[in-house]
């Protein structure tokens, strides 16, 4: 995974810098999201891994499948990625681009998993508290997992706050073993 990220980083950075310079962050994010989804399709994976096809043929096929969703710069990006055999890295490139975009916009995606469904008021309060703590606009994504027993697990980037009963029981069990 770290190797894929290392290979994808220069492409994501170049795409981000281009999109930022041309004030097209949203459209490039959408384009890279589409490209990532297309590259993960089983049929497209076989095309991209086909040794008989040239990089130009792979890029052309890829662009043809995406239709008119790509402008000239995006098509050029796909050709450059194909020439360097990096089309299979499009999911990582897209994810990194979105991280750069979130950093630029001072926002962060936060995944909150709770034992029970959070109502809108609870989600709003949690988003406000997290926004103050992280110093960023928070985009909250709520999910349920009954195995937590109670409490919540919050994930924002590499920050994880485990306030679940399951987590506390696991910590207690570990302490008792020591």
Curated annotation (Swiss-Prot):
This is ATP synthase subunit delta. It is a peripheral membrane protein. One of its GO terms (molecular function) is proton-transporting ATP synthase activity, rotational mechanism. GO terms for cellular component: plasma membrane; proton-transporting ATP synthase complex. Belongs to the ATPase delta chain family. F-type ATPases have 2 components, F(1) - the catalytic core - and F(0) - the membrane proton channel. F(1) has five subunits: alpha(3), beta(3), gamma(1), delta(1), epsilon(1). F(0) has three main subunits: a(1), b(2) and c(10-14). The alpha and beta chains form an alternating ring which encloses part of the gamma chain. F(1) is attached to F(0) by a central stalk formed by the gamma and epsilon chains, while a peripheral stalk is formed by the delta and b chains. It comes from the Bacteria. Pfam families: OSCP (PF00213). It is found in: Cell inner membrane. Its main location: membrane. Keywords: ATP synthesis, Cell inner membrane, Cell membrane, CF(1), Hydrogen ion transport, Ion transport, Membrane, Transport. HAMAP family: ATP_synth_delta_bact (MF_01416).
């Amino acid at each position: 995974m770290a190797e894929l990220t290392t290979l994808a980083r220069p492409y994501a950075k170049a795409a981000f810098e281009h999109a930022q310079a041309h004030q097209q962050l949203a459209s490039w994010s959408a384009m890279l999201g589409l490209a990532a989804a297309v590259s993960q399709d089983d049929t497209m994976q076989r095309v991209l891994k086909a040794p008989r096809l040239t990089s130009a043929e792979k890029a052309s096929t890829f662009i043809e499948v995406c239709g008119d969703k790509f402008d000239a710069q995006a098509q050029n990006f796909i050709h450059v990625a194909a020439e360097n055999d990096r089309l299979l890295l499009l999911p990582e490139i897209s994810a990194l681009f979105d991280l750069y975009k979130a950093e630029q916009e001072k926002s962060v995606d936060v995944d909150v998993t709770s034992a029970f469904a959070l109502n809108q008021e609870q989600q709003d309060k949690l988003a406000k508290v997290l926004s103050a703590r992280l110093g960023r606009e928070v985009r909250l994504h709520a999910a349920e997992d009954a195995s937590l027993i109670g409490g919540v697990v919050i994930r924002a980037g590499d920050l994880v706050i485990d306030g679940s009963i399951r987590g506390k029981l696991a910590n207690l069990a570990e302490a008792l073993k020591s």
